[in-house]
């Protein structure tokens, strides 16, 4: 049994003295795991784009990867702590939450858009927020930010219900604002597929707090790593 495909490194961890357990995201096969030999010469890092060949006797076996790095992520992220933490966050989210062997080509393409913007030193906040929104929607927990859940109005949408993930207008939600989440304009625009200019650091931080709430609630309840890293990340942004 063998296949070959481009993939992005989602994570590695030691497996014995000479191997790593490697997690990669591919466009056509989704999240895949397998063993690969550890090398000090050019160690694999999260975000690396690799040409991966997987081999096993049976499809259900863990299997082994032979990898060639096509593009290293290190130089695009290591000088920017916020960018590096976002890369670490999204790879952790996807390697933890995505089911194995289930293709998510839209999610893969969105990751590549984020990586391209980050590596080109272009505005990338919106690309990252789109990624987290897609993780929720692809796994069945989409936020509905297109209209008010009560009145169906598309105007003055200022809140999100923490219970339903649906938008609420100012008129409907004002009396309950202490129990609701704020709705940043950038999240609504991205969710509705509307092109918008890159958000500010403050709006990015607010959006991360909101998406973090829903990711933690639906997909990462037991991930203390995610909770701690999200606190640090939003703290750095202000």
Swiss-Prot record:
InterPro entries: ARFGAP/RecO, DNA_rep/recomb_RecO_N, RecO, RecO_C. Signal peptide: none annotated. GO terms for cellular component: bacterial nucleoid. SUPFAM superfamilies: ArfGap/RecO-like zinc finger. Pfam families: RecO_C, RecO_N. Keywords: DNA damage, DNA recombination, DNA repair. The keyword Protein biosynthesis does not apply. The keyword DNA repair applies. One of its GO terms (biological process) is double-strand break repair. It comes from the Bacteria. NCBIfam families: reco. Involved in DNA repair and RecF pathway recombination. Belongs to the RecO family. This is DNA repair protein RecO. It comes from Anaplasma marginale (strain St. Maries).
């Amino acid at each position: 049994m063998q296949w070959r495909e481009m993939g992005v490194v989602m994570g590695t961890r030691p497996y014995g003295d000479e191997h790593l357990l490697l997690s990669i995201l591919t466009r056509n096969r989704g999240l895949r795991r397998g063993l690969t030999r550890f090398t000090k010469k050019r160690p694999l890092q999260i975000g690396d784009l690799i040409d991966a060949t997987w081999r096993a006797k049976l499809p259900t076996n863990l299997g082994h990867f032979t990898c060639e790095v096509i593009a290293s992520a290190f130089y695009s992220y290591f000088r920017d702590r916020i960018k590096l933490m976002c890369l670490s966050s999204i790879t952790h989210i996807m390697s933890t939450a995505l089911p194995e062997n289930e293709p998510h080509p839209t999610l893969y393409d969105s990751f590549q858009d984020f990586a391209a913007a980050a590596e080109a030193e272009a505005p990338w906040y919106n690309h990252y927020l789109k990624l987290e929104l897609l993780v929720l929607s692809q796994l069945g927990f989409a936020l509905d930010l297109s209209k008010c859940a009560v009145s169906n109005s598309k105007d003055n949408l200022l809140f999100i219900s923490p219970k339903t993930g649906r938008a609420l207008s100012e008129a409907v939600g004002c009396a309950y604002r202490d129990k609701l989440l704020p709705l940043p304009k950038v999240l609504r625009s991205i969710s509705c597929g509307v092109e918008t200019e890159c958000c500010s650091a403050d709006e990015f931080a607010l959006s991360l707090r909101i998406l973090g709430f829903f990711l933690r609630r639906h997909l990462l309840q037991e991930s203390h790593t995610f909770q701690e890293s999200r606190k640090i990340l939003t703290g750095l942004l202000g």
